[in-house]
Regions:
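Interfacial helix-cap and linker-helix signal at transmembrane-aqueous boundaries
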Residues: 32-33, 64-65, 153-159
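C-terminal transmembrane helical hairpin of 12-TM major facilitator-type secondary transporters
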Residues: 70-116
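Extracytoplasmic gate region of multi-pass secondary transporters
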Residues: 7-48
Length: 199
């Protein structure tokens, strides 16, 4: 599968996507605890808020991507996520601000997932989609592990801002890979109910 340029590019983008999220998320709770005095229950609630954002956004992102294009959604959400990640350490001054930032973060993360998965499956025929998704998930897990491994030493030496900066770089790199190297499948025009009934 990886011998095809577009599939190798999509796989690399999947790796970068999870690496960026890992760099941002892994030390976020510890930073909130150290800098803002956030309690474990407050941090747990923040992740609940983020989960709600994810659940609410995912299906809508899939529908929107069918109308305006999967690549466009992936790129726009990635660039938005890059902005949020860059500003995180500068705008979070209280735990309620962290809730708002994390809510927006998870909206943008969810906006990438469904459209990008659909973009991946459109690259191969039906018989090879399972293999491609398994490969992508494995690379995503590897990317998350690499991000987590880098986050610790960076945090120890330079602080959480270094994690957010490197995470931002990974997210922007993913957007660039998708934008320039991953093809957009043709969108199928929606049929009206009258035409569908006539068929």
């Amino acid at each position: 599968l990886l011998t095809r340029k577009e599939i190798a590019s999509a796989a690399a983008a999947y790796f970068l996507m999870f690496m960026g999220v890992s760099l941002f998320v892994v030390y976020l709770p510890y930073w909130l605890e150290q800098d803002l005095g956030a309690t474990p229950s407050a941090i747990a609630t923040m992740f609940v808020v983020g989960g709600i954002a994810n659940v609410l956004t995912g299906p809508q992102a899939g529908k929107l991507s069918d109308k305006i294009g999967r690549k466009r959604i992936v790129i726009l959400s990635s660039l938005g996520l890059a902005v949020v990640m860059t500003l995180t350490t500068f705008v979070i001054s209280a735990i309620w601000v962290a809730y708002a930032v994390f809510f927006v973060t998870m909206i943008l993360v969810a906006m990438r997932m469904s459209p990008f998965s659909a973009l991946l499956t459109a690259l191969v025929d039906d018989e090879r989609r399972g293999s491609l998704m398994s490969l992508a998930v494995a690379l995503g897990q590897m990317g998350f592990a690499v991000g987590a491994a880098l986050a610790g030493p960076l945090y120890t030496r330079f602080g959480y801002v270094s994690d957010t900066v490197l995470g931002t770089i990974a997210v922007v790199a993913m957007a660039a890979v998708v934008g320039y190297l991953v093809p957009e499948p043709e969108l199928k025009p929606e049929q009206s109910p009258v035409v569908s009934a006539a068929d």
